[in-house]
Amino acid sequence: MSFRKLGHHSPSCNFTASPSRIVILFGLLFLLLGCQKEEMDAPKAIAVSPDGSMEVELMTLNLRYENHQENGKRAWKNRVVGIVGMLQREKVEILGIQEGLHGQVADLWASMPEYGFEGVGRDDGKKRGEYTGIFYRKDRFAADAKNRGSIWLSDTPKQAGSRSWGNSFPRLATWVRLSDRSSGQALWVVNIHLDHINQPSREKGVQLMARKLSEMNRDAEPLVWMGDFNAGELNPAVRYLADGIPASGSSKAFPGLLETFSQLHPKDKERGTLHFWMNDPNRQWKVDHIFVSKQAKVLDARIVKSGEPYLSDHFPVKARVRFVK
């Protein structure tokens, strides 16, 4: 038994299933067989929007990396089936994941063959280390082979595994330009995972990706920028994107994006996404964000909360957005 290959950068990576992976696969198979028949049929054509607009269901989710210290309900093999079920219920079309190790991403992709994937392991640019990856529905979007990739948030962004600015670990951002089959519009998607300790690193990381994006997206096509920023809404790294306020060491302001949850729920006090496996709103922090172009209309935005057993130590963040030509 083997898992599929991951990422367009990866050479032929076959995955031999361990006993624990076999248990996971049987659980996922049971979940898939339990779906309604119409959900398992071949993808159907999507009606073209009369006004050329593009409505998209977005989500970002830090998976919590698989490790031997977390057992029982927190073990990956006991969480993955719930995650796949949640993604099916939420009808997610574009998903940004963080912290997923190679086996975790393979488990998800094997259970979601209707999705394409973009991403690499942060340690070697292939399959070692955590992924900051992007899943997208292939029946809805086509990926632009010339505009996709990953960069390391460092002084040497093309060097796999590189780190600078006091990063505790290699950090990276992944992007892909998608073409919407229903409207013909292009959509740039960026997924980022910033450092959890070093503030200068967070600020320099978003600036680096912003510069890269400005070089690629010269036509100012619609943009989604999501991820685990390890920073709240008032943090300079986040405000650089949301308000166009220059971050430390930057002489140029970013054009500014809409933070989807804040757009609809500016005064909601229970907005934490990082919960540390605890049901205590006073000890939860909103570090996971979905940003979109200012021209977009945010139709819905919410934190997908669930009781125990938790899917991760982060709550997923969901947004439904309409982009207009």
Residue spans for each PLM region:
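Bacterial N-terminal signal peptides that target proteins for export
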Residues: F3-I24
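N-terminal, active-site-proximal structural segment of metallo-dependent hydrolase catalytic domains
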Residues: L32-S111, D124-E130, W285, K325
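Short, solvent-exposed loop/turn elements at domain surfaces
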Residues: Y65-K73, I97, D144, Q199, ...
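Bacterial N-terminal signal peptides
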Residues: V23-L32
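Active-site beta-strand/loop signature of hydrolases that rely on acidic residues for catalysis
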Residues: V56-L63, I83-L108, F135, V176, ...
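Structured beta-strand-rich core segments of catalytic domains in phosphoester-bond hydrolases
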Residues: P43-P50, I94, Q98-A186
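Acidic/histidine-rich helix-loop elements
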Residues: T60-V81, L153-S168, D195-N198
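Active site of divalent-metal-dependent phosphoester/diester hydrolases
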Residues: E118-K138, S154-K158, S164-P170, A220, ...
